[in-house]
Structures are given as structure tokens and as C-alpha cells.
Amino acid sequence: MSEVVVGLDVHLKNTQVTVMKLNGEIIKRERVQASKKELKRCLESVPKGSGVALESAGFCWPWIDFLKELEFEPLLANPLKVKLRAEDVKNDKVDSRTLAHLTRMNWLPTCYVPPSELRWLRSLLRHRAFRTKLSTGVKNRTKSEFRKRDITLDADLKTLKGRRAAFNLDVFEVKQNVELLDLMDRQSKEIEAMLRRKYGDLKPVQLLMSIPGVGFTSALTLYAEICDIKRFSHPEKLAHYAGLVPKVRQSGEHSSMGRESKGDKWLKWIFIEAAWSHVRFCPEGHLAEVFSEVCNRKGNKKDAIKVVARKLVNVVWYVWTYEKEFVVK
């Protein structure tokens, strides 16, 4: 490690910088504008290869890439775990100073930094998921317009027949919604074609698609969110990362299961979606039996599908790790 470490508290308009020696002596503490030019000027005296810590945030990636360009070692701090180790008093100076302190002592809890290509893929898949949710909202609003006017359609809005029937009703709001749905469908097909063209031949994606209920988009989302299966030495660790392991509360001899641990919300979402699909596509399989058993015992489908999703984590881990296609038994 270099003789100097840096803590950055990055905001949209400004950045608090703390440069610190390994003995804890603060060399520089400065607030600069949130621009690459200003940050480069502020770090001119810092030796190349020094560790530069900053908290994970939605806008941190350009700064990570820029620090790499400047030949520093960017360290992405986990904000939740940093809070557990940081001081109770919290302001900008304490934040950047705390990050520098934790870095020099090798106590900084860090996050995985995916390659830029996978970050772009994650963003595109999340954009696609947002559009799917938006499309569902438009369909629901259109159905609401039908109920207001006591209109009944013989076909679903998902079909061309249903769209044409809705458009021909000559209701202004419904017409606009149908046009919007058509536009979103065309754009979604463009996204799908681009994803298949670019990532359709990836081996992990092909392997994951062998699992019933895991289609191309689900497999690609799992690939983008996990990035490298070697990060997880055991499926239990992947389950924790996905937030699919319930917390255990224990008092004396009594223990109870609480809510799941907080993990990657996108990974948790896609595992649950894939679990629903798997149960539908493979009703005679082991996981479908687990779903039925938990449903009968708890009477709650949501709890049951989470159990299936947790078991699906094991399947994904083994298929990807050992590069063997899933076989239905």
C-alpha cells in the first residue's frame, strides 16, 4: 500500500477530499467542485497507486473510472457497513475522514466493482424492467377507463385483436394508451434484439437457460447481477447476497425466523420471478413439490415462492459453477 490514502465524499455539486498518511496524520482536507478537472488538481500531489475510498452511490461509476485513469486504486465502500464502523457524528468532513481512516487500517468494507461492460448491461436490463412495469401500468389505466364506461372487451390488451378493438372504441384516453403500448412494444423488441445479438451466445447465459422457467432475459439478468460466480464459494453466500436468507432471532433457548437479509434487490426479484416460472413450467418437478408443501403448511404463496427461490439459488450456483446443464428428474 502507498504511504498515503484518500477518502472522498462525493456529492452532485461538490466533493469533500481527505488525504491522510498511514499514521493517521491528515495532509489535506479540501472541498472541491464535483468536476474531474478539480479532483485531478486536488490529487496531483498524491502518489499513483494510492487507495482512494468513496461510498457506493448511483453516480459513483464515472468517478471510479476516472480514478483508474489517474492510476489510483478506487475502493468502493459499502455504505451500510461503513455506518456500523463510523462515528456517530456525521457530516461531510467526518465522512471523508472516516473513509480514509478505515482505508489506512484495512478496515474498509468494500463492494464488488463490476466491469464497465457489465455495468452498462445492468443499466439496460433495469431500464427494460422499468419499461415492463410502465407498460403494465398503462394497461391497468386502460382497463380502468373501460370500467368507468362499462365497456367489456372480448380480447386482452396484450393481443393485436384486443388493441384494435380498444382503439376502435373512439375513446380519447384509450386511443392514446393503445398508441403508447404499441410504441413501448416496438422499443422493447429493439432492446430484446440488441441483447440477443450481443449476449445470446454467452456460455453462462446458455447454461442458465437450461433451467425450466429461466428464459433469455432472466438468464441474462442473473449473469449481469452476479457477474462472476467465483465470487461466491458456496450457494449460501449467493443466497445471502440476493437477500433470500431469513434472519434468525434467538433469545435463550428460543429462536425464530425473521425477515430476509437485505441484499441485491434486483437479484432477489429475478430469482423470485424465475421461481414462479419454474413452478409453472415444471409442475412435476421437485421445486414444485416444495412449493405445494409449503403452501399447504403455511397457507401463503408468497412465503412458499421465497422458499423455492432460495432453492433455485442452489440450482443456479451448481449449473454455473460446474458448467453443466440442468436435467429434470
Model-derived features: positions:
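Short alpha-helix plus adjacent loop in nuclease-associated cores
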Residues: L75-S123, L160-R164, H254-K262
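Conserved DEDDh/DEDDy metal-dependent 3′-5′ exonuclease domain
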Residues: K36, R41-L84
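Phosphate-backbone recognition surface of nucleic-acid-processing proteins
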Residues: N91, L207-S210, F216, L220-K301
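Glycine-rich, often acidic, oxyanion-interacting loops/wings at catalytic, nucleic-acid
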Residues: L125-V205
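Low-complexity, acidic/Ser/Thr- and charged residue-rich accessory regions of DNA metabolism proteins
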Residues: G252-E253, M257, V290-K329
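Gly/Thr-rich phosphate-binding beta-strand-loop-beta motif of the actin/hexokinase/Hsp70
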Residues: S2-K21, L99, R131
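Intrinsically disordered, low-complexity and often Lys/Arg-enriched segments
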Residues: M1-V4, E25, K37, V328-K329
